[in-house]
């Protein structure tokens, strides 16, 4: 016979037991953490409240992301809180945020083995699969070892391979006849053309289009059309998945999946072409020069492995350099005195116009252009390619700064804790760059103070995961800037908005267009 009292007592007793277990667990965990903190000699980080489980912060962050002001919001948050390291919740996940150089150094270098990528692999896998930017441990080491030869000095030094792409870019500039045009879209096409040639052995030739009467001359294949837009869209979703922390799986709509499919189709063209090559053809490619894809085919014939590695390096080869060039010309167009000083250096070393000495523009000679180097440093300071990143603790550990009344004591980092580090905010900190830290001023890089920055200047990450392609990016950007200065001495801005709205996905670029004129 059904006994209400018996059932009631049964559930009441189990609720009581469950509650007791939960309380006991939290008490035990609290005591354990206190013991570990004492052993490590650290304290808890300061905590900031962000509403119910941080869902308000997630909403606010997504709103700023849509408006192109997310990195500004994150920087201003440090200023509002008044601390360079603090703890908060977003979408229910506890996160520690820091812009302290000592903490970033610990994350990336001195305590490298204490931290890993955590949820990034799962967040990025639908687009990037298993590659250098998504893997940890032996998988990451293997990917890095495969990529390293591609970025050896001999490969990076071949700047002359960029010239045909510069000539295509120049056709688009001349088509504007001295009027305003969007240079950022052209830079993204330029860098994907050079990256595909450099990495895959064949350029996608995206600059050869109908507007300059060269569409029929360009290589065409199934998957090329719509690739750029799909790649951009997929990255937007990856960045939202990253913001959502452990709730990333909720961001998986039809547009995201469709974009991934289009990008994969693009990469599969190059993969199949390499897989269809005979051993003799592969050997000939090797003799002509190191091409990443064809060397990789000698190690594996798994099309998914090949595709994943291609997309990982294409992301770095296209987006970071295009963003760097776009921000550079955005600032140059607004600062004619900087443009004049830059041209003076370029013309003195390499000539100009019809008297340009292309044979003098080499990897070595570009590195000796001191003002050009200062210009790129200043652009990378104000607009770092990867403005924010994160790591996840592999074990109970600590970071050296952020605790105590003076924020100079080590803080406790629990196993599984997410730690974000914001290079964008650190690069604009008055403590390191003075009262004019928000001002674009390349001359600061000739001042003694900038030689003592250490980890306070971090445009290419640091530690064992430091960017393999930094010299490739700097060399390509330097060559493009030098050649455009030689070909088009007159530069003007047609963009009144300052500061610019910035799209911060996996890398950073302008939210919309970069309107300039060159003649």
UniProtKB/Swiss-Prot annotation:
GO cellular component labels: membrane
Induction profile: By N-alkanes.
Keyword Iron: yes
UniProt enzyme class: oxidoreductase
Compartment(s) of residence: Membrane
EC number from the UniProt entry: 1.14.14.-
Cofactor(s) this protein requires: heme
Gene Ontology molecular function terms on file: heme binding; iron ion binding; oxidoreductase activity, acting on paired donors, with incorporation or reduction of molecular oxygen, reduced flavin or flavoprotein as one donor, and incorporation of one atom of oxygen
Keywords recorded for this protein, A-Z: Heme, Iron, Membrane, Metal-binding, Monooxygenase, Oxidoreductase
Keyword GTP-binding: no
Binding site for heme: 467
InterPro entries (alphabetical): Cyt_P450, Cyt_P450_CS, Cyt_P450_E_CYP52_ascomycetes, Cyt_P450_E_CYP52_fungi, Cyt_P450_E_grp-II, Cyt_P450_sf
Stated role: Together with an NADPH cytochrome P450 the enzyme system catalyzes the terminal hydroxylation as the first step in the assimilation of alkanes and fatty acids.
UniProt family annotation: Belongs to the cytochrome P450 family.
Protein name from the UniProt record: Cytochrome P450 52A12
Organism: Debaryomyces hansenii
Gene: CYP52A12
């Amino acid at each position: 016979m059904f006994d209400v009292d018996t059932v009631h007592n049964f559930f009441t007793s189990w609720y009581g037991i469950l509650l007791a277990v939960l309380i006991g667990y939290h008490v035990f965990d609290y005591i354990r953490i206190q013991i570990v903190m004492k052993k490590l000699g650290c304290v808890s980080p300061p905590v900031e409240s962000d509403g119910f489980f941080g869902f308000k912060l997630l909403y606010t962050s997504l709103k700023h992301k849509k408006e192109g002001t997310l990195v500004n919001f994150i920087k201003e948050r440090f200023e509002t809180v008044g601390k360079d390291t603090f703890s908060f919740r977003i979408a229910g996940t506890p996160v520690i945020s820091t812009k302290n150089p000592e903490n970033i150094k610990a994350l990336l270098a001195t305590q490298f083995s204490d931290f890993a990528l955590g949820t990034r692999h799962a967040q990025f896998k639908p687009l990037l699969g298993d590659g250098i930017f998504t893997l940890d441990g032996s998988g990451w080491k293997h990917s890095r070892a495969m990529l390293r030869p591609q970025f050896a000095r001999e490969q990076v030094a071949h700047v002359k391979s960029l010239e045909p792409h510069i000539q295509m870019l120049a056709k688009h500039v001349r088509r504007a006849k001295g009027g305003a045009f969007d240079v950022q879209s052209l830079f993204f096409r330029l860098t994907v053309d050079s990256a595909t040639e450099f990495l895959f052995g064949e350029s996608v030739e995206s600059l050869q289009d109908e507007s300059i009467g060269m569409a029929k001359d360009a290589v065409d294949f199934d998957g090329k059309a719509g690739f750029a837009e799909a790649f951009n869209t997929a990255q937007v979703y990856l960045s939202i998945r990253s913001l959502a922390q452990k709730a990333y799986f909720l961001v998986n709509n039809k547009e995201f999946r469709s974009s991934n499919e289009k990008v994969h189709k693009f990469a599969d063209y190059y993969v199949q072409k390499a897989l269809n090559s005979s051993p003799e053809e592969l050997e000939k490619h090797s003799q002509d020069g190191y091409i990443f894809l064809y060397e990789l085919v000698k190690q594996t014939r798994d099309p998914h492995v090949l595709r994943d590695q291609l997309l990982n390096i294409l992301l770095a080869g296209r987006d970071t350099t295009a963003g760097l060039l776009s921000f550079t010309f955005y600032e140059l167009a607004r600062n004619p005195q900087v443009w004049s000083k830059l041209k003076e250096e370029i013309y003195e070393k390499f000539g100009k116009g019809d008297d340009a000495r292309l044979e003098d523009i080499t990897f070595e000679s570009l590195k000796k252009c001191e003002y050009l180097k200062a210009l790129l440093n200043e652009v990378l300071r104000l607009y770092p390619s990867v403005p924010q990143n994160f790591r996840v603790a592999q074990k109970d550990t600590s970071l050296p700064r952020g605790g105590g009344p003076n924020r100079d004591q080590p803080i406790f980092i629990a196993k599984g804790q997410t730690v974000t580090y914001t290079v964008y905010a650190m690069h604009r900190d008055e403590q390191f760059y003075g009262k004019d830290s928000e001002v674009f001023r390349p001359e600061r890089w000739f001042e003694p103070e900038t030689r003592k920055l250490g980890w306070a200047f971090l445009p290419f990450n640091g530690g064992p995961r430091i960017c393999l392609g930094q010299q490739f990016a700097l060399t390509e950007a330097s060559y493009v800037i030098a050649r455009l200065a030689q070909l088009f001495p007159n530069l003007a801005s047609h963009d009144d908005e300052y500061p610019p709205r910035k799209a911060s996905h996996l890398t950073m670029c302008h939210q919309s267009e970069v309107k300039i004129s060159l003649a």
